[in-house]
């Protein structure tokens, strides 16, 4: 395989008036690429609609009827979990907050964690009930806890779907139980699945195959994961299955191997075995096409930053964390590494964040990492001659 070439560009974009540097506010990995996918996967998925993608970049590897609307069944609960995880990570609720179950919670049919009226469970336990057992009662309990009623929660679900660009989705409830107009698409499900993956704590629950909750109960709650791939498919750690007579067998499945993550959404499979087979084969295909590459490692020297024209005064910009990207195997991609230093800093201490390093494939941003200074730079030293700094643009292979 031809060795990948990396182009290092040091960009110091400074207006002569020393106005603030303009940093990008939207990144390519926040949108799913809608380019035609390579559809040669070696088999024909039997589900009505599928999509396979690399979730970090959003690159679609394979799709079939990905924009056709179908009932999503309990895959709906991905949005329920997403809103819960956003509330947790925003600090509005905690995993140990108490949820008191209502009469409506007890009355929910279908998949259940057998919650009783007045029963008190933690947010974490309810999340487990949703992620593992696909509990309709757990989903309603979470909805009522967050918004006061399931109806109000459904409004929030639709608002979030709109924000995410899920243009072919409408939610009527938090559970996915059949309801008129409750529809989504494989592509939209992949969008909310990618968003949920930004809250990796959820994988601590969706990856569990069996769990027992016994505290405060005479009869323990036995949870068994409806997603059998977490037990039988190497690297699978989520996300959510679904089934109703209307929807048939659905899943949003994800797995990691060798630091590469795949996401496959299946809608309308004729059986749970076929659903799992389609998801497994698609992810196998994805893993055969993509690889993970480490660009920089934590605390490594990324770039020497000159402070004068001679270059005898400088500091070293070092990586705050590892920077790994997922790229297609066997391609001729030219990865561009760009180092951006904030020119407005007048004084820095050792360890201060001074900018960031980005990696691109063409115009597509694959990843970024913050950079910090290895030493103190006094105000009198920092960017002493702006014109000299502007002339320091590096372009070479490494």
Predicted regions, residues:
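Domain-terminus/edge residues, biased toward the C-terminal soluble/receptor-binding domains
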Residues: 166-167, 178-183, 187-398
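Active-site-adjacent loops and short helices of periplasmic peptidoglycan-processing enzymes
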Residues: 24-200
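Mixed-charge, polar/low-complexity N-terminal
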Residues: 7, 31-37, 41-43, 73-74, ...
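Sec-dependent N-terminal signal peptides of Gram-positive bacterial secreted proteins and lipoproteins
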Residues: 2-27
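Structural motif marking the loop-to-transmembrane transition
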Residues: 3-4, 72, 123, 379-382, ...
């Amino acid at each position: 395989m031809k060795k990948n070439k990396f182009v290092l560009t040091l960009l110091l974009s400074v207006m002569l008036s020393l106005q603030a540097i303009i940093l990008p506010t939207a990144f390519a990995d926040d949108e799913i690429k809608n380019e035609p996918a390579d559809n040669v996967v070696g088999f024909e998925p039997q589900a009505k609609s599928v999509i396979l993608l690399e979730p970090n970049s959003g690159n679609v590897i394979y799709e079939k009827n990905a924009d056709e609307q179908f009932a999503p069944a309990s895959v709906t609960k991905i949005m329920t979990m997403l809103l819960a995880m956003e509330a947790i990570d925003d600090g509005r609720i905690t995993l140990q907050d108490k949820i008191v179950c209502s009469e409506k919670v007890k009355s929910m049919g279908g998949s259940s964690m057998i919650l009783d009226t007045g029963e008190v469970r933690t947010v974490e336990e309810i999340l487990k009930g949703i992620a593992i057992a696909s509990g309709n009662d757990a989903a309603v309990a979470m909805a009522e806890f967050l918004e006061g009623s399931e109806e109000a929660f459904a409004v929030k679900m639709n608002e979030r779907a709109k924000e995410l660009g899920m243009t072919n989705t409408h939610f009527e409830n938090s559970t996915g139980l059949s309801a008129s107009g409750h529809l989504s698409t494989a592509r939209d499900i992949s969008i909310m699945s990618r968003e949920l993956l930004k809250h990796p704590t959820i994988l601590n629950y969706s990856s569990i195959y069996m769990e027992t909750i016994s505290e405060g109960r005479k009869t323990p709650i036995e949870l068994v994961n409806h997603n059998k791939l977490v037990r039988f498919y190497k690297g699978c750690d989520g996300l959510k299955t679904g089934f109703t007579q209307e929807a048939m067998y659905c899943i949003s499945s994800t797995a990691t191997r060798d630091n590469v993550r795949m996401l496959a959404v299946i809608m309308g499979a004729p059986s749970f075995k076929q659903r799992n087979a389609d998801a497994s084969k698609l992810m196998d295909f994805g893993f055969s096409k993509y690889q993970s590459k480490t660009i920089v490692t934590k605390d490594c020297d990324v770039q020497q930053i000159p402070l004068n024209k001679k270059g005898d005064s400088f500091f070293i910009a070092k990586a705050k964390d590892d920077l790994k990207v997922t790229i297609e195997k066997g391609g001729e991609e030219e990865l561009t590494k760009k180092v951006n230093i904030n020119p407005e800093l007048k004084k820095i201490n050792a360890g201060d964040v001074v900018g960031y390093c980005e990696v691109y494939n063409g115009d597509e941003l694959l990843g970024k990492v913050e950079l910090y200074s290895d030493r103190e730079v006094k105000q009198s030293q920092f960017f002493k001659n702006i014109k000299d700094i502007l002339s320091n643009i590096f372009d070479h292979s490494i």
